[in-house]
Amino acid sequence: MGQGKVINQLPPWSVEQLENETPKCPFPKSDDKRVLSGIKVLELCRIIAGPVITRILAEYGADVLKITSPSLSDVPFFQVDGNMGKHAAELDLKTASGRKLFEELLADVDVFVDGYRPGALESLGYGPARLTELAKARGKGIVYIQEDCFGFDGEWAGRPGWQQIADCVSLAHVKHRPS
């Protein structure tokens, strides 16, 4: 079955509860009246979809920190729109000092957005299972958003890619196909 057929059989998003041991916590108090004011978001995304997700969170008041790699910089063309309302920092997760600082950031965030191909952050030790462990250790849950180009099923599931390529593969641009 082609990747487009696999993707088209799935819902646009899914929600999975990774754990239910950490206590619920109230939204932070703030003078800012936007609904997500006081919510801290850590973004590891590059192109279009992930940065747009976090830009919208920032528009609703969330404090978003975008992390880029020194070996895989942000695409300048997309920075103008995709990074509005965010803070940005460069961090190398392949070094001990980078990992230490990253874990300090993780200790305080409410939302983590992973926009890399499936398994990329997990190979560095920061997949959903590890972040769930960190959340339990700090006594406060975390929302883990995992967004990728081709979905998590099918022959293309592990590939990196851009939305335009996924649209072509899945025929998302076709409104009606004659029978």
Regions found by a protein language model. Name each.
Residues 2-179:
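N-terminal helix-loop segment corresponding to the beta1-alpha1 unit
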